[in-house]
């Protein structure tokens, strides 16, 4: 039997034809090549399947799975996690871009710091054309060696996309994964933070695309409630959960039993003026 690649990349997607090919080019062109890319197509109705099949024929590292029906946003994210075979895992989006050395820098950081559970990098927002519009600031003390400090900071000090970092698969699987509510990634971030410190690579290597169709914390703040859980009729159930409720779910005993006690310029974009 062929040995599993060390890293599994999960890419859940629904109707992603506008940006998917560009994102796949950035992932498949990484300097770190020892990975399998698992794409879960959530019953897309556009050209997503054709794009995946085309790239799958060109690169054997791609494993394409099409869901027979739409299973919902968060269940599709959880599905790619269940398919992970590597000791490391990274979640990706079909519309984002990645600098060529992103994976290598994060994997190297995990190798150099065995106590770290996630390695991520500085992040920038890009527009629909791939131009950098904003360099994001990180305020969360996720690198603290003290679990209580990490926990407090994640609840109170900010929002960072650590769930898009490279993480240890066994640690991720000790969490409850993504719930069907807004800020589910913040919940899982906090669970991961209880298990160990995070490492931030001090370079802008991850480029998040901001566009009208994107489901993100930014759309929540402008009053948009997306449909995240599949219902009996195949439609979704709209759920909005505030930060306080999400944080409360983490602090309940059922959420902490799984956690051990504590022991630039883009290749495709341009910098904004100023």
Q: What positions do the PLM features span?
A:
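Short, well-formed alpha-helical segments that are part of the catalytic scaffolds
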Residues: 15-29
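Short aromatic/hydrophobic "clamp" motif used to bind/position activated sugar donors
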Residues: 89
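Conserved donor NDP-sugar-binding/catalytic core segment of glycosyltransferases
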Residues: 101-135
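Glycine-rich, basic loop-to-helix element that forms the pyrophosphate-binding segment
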Residues: 67-84, 97
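A conserved acidic beta->alpha catalytic loop
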Residues: 41-50, 69, 93
């Amino acid at each position: 039997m062929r040995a599993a690649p060390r890293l599994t990349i999960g890419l859940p997607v629904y109707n992603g034809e506008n940006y998917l090919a560009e994102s796949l080019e950035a992932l498949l062109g990484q300097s770190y090549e020892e990975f399998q890319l698992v794409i879960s197509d959530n019953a897309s109705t556009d050209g997503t399947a054709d794009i995946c099949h085309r790239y799958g024929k060109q690169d054997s590292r791609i494993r394409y799975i099409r869901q027979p029906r739409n299973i919902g946003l968060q269940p599709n994210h959880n599905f790619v996690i269940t398919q992970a075979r590597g000791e490391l895992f990274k979640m990706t989006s079909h519309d984002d871009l990645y600098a060529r050395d992103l994976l290598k820098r994060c994997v190297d950081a995990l190798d150099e710091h065995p106590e770290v559970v996630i390695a991520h990098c500085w992040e920038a927002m890009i527009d629909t054309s791939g131009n950098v519009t904003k360099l994001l600031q990180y305020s969360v003390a996720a690198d603290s060696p003290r679990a209580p400090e990490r926990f407090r900071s994640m609840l109170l000090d900010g929002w960072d996309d650590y769930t898009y970092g490279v993480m240890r698969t066994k640690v991720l699987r000790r969490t409850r994964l993504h719930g069907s509510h807004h800020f589910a990634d913040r919940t899982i971030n906090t669970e991961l933070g209880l298990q160990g410190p995070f490492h931030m690579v001090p370079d802008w290597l991850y480029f998040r695309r901001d566009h009208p169709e994107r489901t993100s914390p930014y759309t929540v703040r402008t009053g948009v409630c997306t449909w995240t859980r599949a219902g009996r009729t195949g439609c979704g159930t709209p759920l909005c959960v505030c930060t306080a409720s999400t944080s409360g779910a983490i602090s309940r005993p059922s959420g902490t039993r799984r956690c051990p006690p504590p022991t630039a310029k883009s290749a495709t974009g341009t910098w904004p003026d100023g």
